[in-house]
Amino acid sequence: MTEYKLVVVGAGGVGKSALTIQLIQNHFVDEYDPTIEDSYRKQVVIDGETCLLDILDTAGQEEYSAMRDQYMRTGEGFLCVFAINNTKSFEDIHQY
């Protein structure tokens, strides 16, 4: 089975974990709980082929920025998340 590594990046508090948990568990988390790093796996069908998504939910806080290089080397796909009510989170997305 083909495996894809998806890395979810963006500023702290923009909803990376909420989006990830919605995808994995079909449940929306509405309480903010800062993430350092969480990893999830889900079997999905992409272009008619059953695949395994290995999803890495990353920390957005600046103090964890040193870990980003490792994420960028191992990731095969990236989901850049920003908050529509936080212009700075959109302007800063290029950092990821």
Curated annotation (Swiss-Prot):
Transmembrane segments: none annotated. The modification N-acetylmethionine is found at residue 1. Keywords: Acetylation, Cell membrane, Golgi apparatus, GTP-binding, Hydrolase, Lipoprotein, Membrane, Nucleotide-binding, Palmitate, Proto-oncogene, Ubl conjugation. The keyword Ubl conjugation applies. GTP binds at residues 10-17, 57-61. Coiled coil: none annotated. GO terms for molecular function: G protein activity; GTP binding. It is found in: Cell membrane; Golgi apparatus; Golgi apparatus membrane. It catalyses: GTP + H2O = GDP + phosphate + H(+). GO terms for cellular component: Golgi apparatus; Golgi membrane; plasma membrane. Gene3D superfamilies: P-loop containing nucleotide triphosphate hydrolases (3.40.50.300). A motif (Effector region) lies at residues 32-40. Belongs to the small GTPase superfamily. Ras family. NCBIfam families: small_GTP. This is GTPase HRas.
